[in-house]
Amino acid sequence: CGVRMMHNDGSDALESRRGLPGPMTAFYKMSGLCARFPYHPRLGHYYMSGMTWDEPGKIEVISGAFCMLRHVALDNVGLLDEDFFMYGEDIDLSYRILKGGFENWYVPTRILHYKGESTQKSSFRYVHVFYEAMLIFFHKHYSGLSMVISIPIKMAIMGKALMSLFSMMIRRAKHSLGFFDRPPKPLSFLFIGAESCMTEFKRIARENGLEAKFIVGTEQDLPKGHLSPGLEISGNCCVVYDTDSYSNSSIFKIFGSRPQPGVEMGTYSKQNSTVITMGGIYQ
């Protein structure tokens, strides 16, 4: 089974549940039709967007970022295929699990997923490995298709890869000519926790040069956290919760109830006086 993965702004990660990239589903994904019509039962099948987020349900592909697998299923269908590297192996394994007579399920238990932090998506190697994985999957499971179907699929995959490379080359050329994107507004911090945490919060902010505000609150007396009436939060803000004052499930529920672009999630552990955010670790 797979779970409900969240981005660090509280929004749901679409790859929490996916459909098998069969010939037409893959074509819709590569051609952009899936993104254009995400809730269409056929065009948007890759992300299974017609499913509710709050209830368990059968899916076709579980994410390799976080999943639980039965030992008996792996004994029957085998482990990850080493022909893949980094991408595609979870789709391949999910397909083999289904072919082995088992089921894949989505469970709405939330986890925080720092997506893409283990890869550099602006590299040529990323583009090569990512799209090569799609071709490996296609050759492995759909090699028997007629050329009338297979050629457009391969062209869509390679076309998407070329577009990604071209876009990357343009960005690098602009940088080499001295054109840079406008720097983002500096990240500010909002620390929320019990009164006993305030001294340590202020020390961490001071020693790490963080622009910060501090709110005394717990799950009991400030249940809505940073979404409470009267708290004004602008973009590019990291809200750090003390995990002794707020459970992880409560933090996820608060962020998930109203995701805000630029408002990120952070956590503070009293046991080791450490703040963890997507952008760094502070002590």
Predicted regions and their residues:
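Conserved donor NDP-sugar-binding/catalytic core segment of glycosyltransferases
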Residues: C1-G19
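Short, flexible, basic/aromatic active-site loop/helix in glycosyltransferases
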Residues: V3, L20-I59
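Short secondary-structure boundary segments
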Residues: R4, T109, T243
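A generic structural motif
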Residues: G19-L20, D83
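Short linear elements at protein peripheries
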Residues: L43-F66, M168-M198
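A short, conserved alpha-helix in the catalytic core of glycosyltransferases
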Residues: M51-E55, E60-R110, G256
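Active-site-adjacent helix/loop segment of glycosyltransferases
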Residues: Y95-R171
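A solvent-exposed beta-alpha-beta segment
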Residues: F179-Q283
